[in-house]
Amino acid sequence: MHSRSALLYRFLRPASRCFSSSSAVTPVTVTQSPKSLEALRARLANESPSLTDFIHGDTYSVEVGTKKKPLPKPKWMKESIPGGERYVQIKKKLRDLKLHTVCEEAKCPNLGECWSGGETGTATATIMILGDTCTRGCRFCNVKTSRTPPPPDPNEPNNVAEAIASWGVDYVVITSVDRDDLPDQGSGHFAETVQRLKFLKPEMLIEALVPDFRGDGGCVEKVSKSGLDVLAHNIETVEELQSFVRDHRANFKQSLDVLRMAKEYAPAGTLTKTSVMLGCGETPDQVVKTMEKVRAAGVDVMTFGQYMRPSKRHMPVAEYVTPDAFERYRLLGMEMGFRYVASGPMVRSSYKAGEYYIKSMIEADRVASPSTSP
């Protein structure tokens, strides 16, 4: 492993070309020939600007406005307005089935793209189970909170599984609110939903974006062995900002432990994944250090996206990180050994284009190692 200062010097420097947010989901694998990796290193080594120039210049981030001095969002943060026939259809279907989506609850900027089908032509949504009310209150999240949310619907696992199975999609993301009020943190409900969906549609690939279950190994094991294909748990921000960004019951070590346990308990071939928001006040060095620890925990996939303030009640955006800087983190992740890195201002943990690449990666793994097939 290279020293952190060397990694920063090599990767966090302005490139000679500009990157759009669409470049964030360019498929990346770390299985390269030595020759191609040497070519990458040579290209990076030939770029002369220093780390100091990168961090303090306009290449890394742009200023965020204040109430007295408002500034428009940078051009790469412009969102598409939700609409179109498919968007209307999927919204109606979700309402009819009384299903919650994190897309709406968290005010995801990609809602219009994913629900309308985007470039792939297939509409997707991330389903949220265990209700729409969380027991925690993270400073970045728009989901409703309560110490005593309504009890989970016992029929939800079956209803959700039947609804998703009827959509005709082949990759789905299921997530949930935190349920600290339940004895098993909601892990049994989560596992039952995955198991029921796999029973109805065995060929469907399922990504479970889970809470930390308060670090309970039994809960992590239960979900990890439920039949999912990808277990995701988000660390959300760098280690140094955990207490500022997340609820006091969440912390960096606990989240890393969840990811480690998931890799230990899940069947061979199951991928683990995590996500980090940038623009919360972190430094490049803190990001690199966090990436190193995440990779050491055996995580396969990592995503980076720009934090966007959902309302004035939430923590403000510290800075808008440029597409160029996001691309640097993607390259660094590739060099560190992550199997896939999605990094761009509009990338979110459950990002449509990233899901399609992970799907193809899983299918390729199963062709190479038939024993890992379900």
Curated annotation (Swiss-Prot):
Which domain of life does the protein's organism represent? Eukaryota
Q: Name one Pfam family in it.
A: LIAS_N
Transit peptide: first to last position: 1-19
Which catalysed reactions does the entry list for this protein? [[Fe-S] cluster scaffold protein carrying a second [4Fe-4S](2+) cluster] + N(6)-octanoyl-L-lysyl-[protein] + 2 oxidized [2Fe-2S]-[ferredoxin] + 2 S-adenosyl-L-methionine + 4 H(+) = [[Fe-S] cluster scaffold protein] + N(6)-[(R)-dihydrolipoyl]-L-lysyl-[protein] + 4 Fe(3+) + 2 hydrogen sulfide + 2 5'-deoxyadenosine + 2 L-methionine + 2 reduced [2Fe-2S]-[ferredoxin]
Keyword check for Metal-binding: yes
What keywords tag this UniProt record? 4Fe-4S, Iron, Iron-sulfur, Metal-binding, Mitochondrion, S-adenosyl-L-methionine, Transferase, Transit peptide
According to its UniProt entry, the protein's GO biological process terms are: glycine catabolic process
Q: What class of enzyme is it?
A: transferase
Q: How is the cofactor bound?
A: Binds 2 [4Fe-4S] clusters per subunit. One cluster is coordinated with 3 cysteines and an exchangeable S-adenosyl-L-methionine.
Q: Which GO terms describe its cellular component?
A: mitochondrial matrix
InterPro entries from the UniProt entry: Aldolase_TIM (IPR013785), Elp3/MiaA/NifB-like_rSAM (IPR006638), LIAS_N (IPR031691), Lipoyl_synth (IPR003698), Lipoyl_synth_mt (IPR027527), rSAM (IPR007197)
Swiss-Prot/TrEMBL cofactor(s): [4Fe-4S] cluster
Q: Which CDD domains match?
A: Radical_SAM
EC numbers for this chain: 2.8.1.8
Q: Name one GO molecular function term.
A: metal ion binding
Tissue expression summary: Expressed in leaves and flowers, but not in roots. Expressed in roots, rosette leaves, cauline leaves, stems, flowers and siliques.
- Ranges of residues in domain Radical SAM core: 119-339
Its family? Belongs to the radical SAM superfamily. Lipoyl synthase family.
Function of the molecule: Together with LIP2 is essential for mitochondrial protein lipoylation during seed development. Required for the lipoylation of mitochondrial pyruvate dehydrogenase component E2 proteins in leaves and roots.
For this entry, the protein name equals Lipoyl synthase, mitochondrial
| Biological source species | Arabidopsis thaliana (Mouse-ear cress)
What broad taxonomic lineage does this protein's source fall under? Eukaryota, Viridiplantae, Streptophyta, Embryophyta, Tracheophyta
- Gene responsible for this protein: LIP1
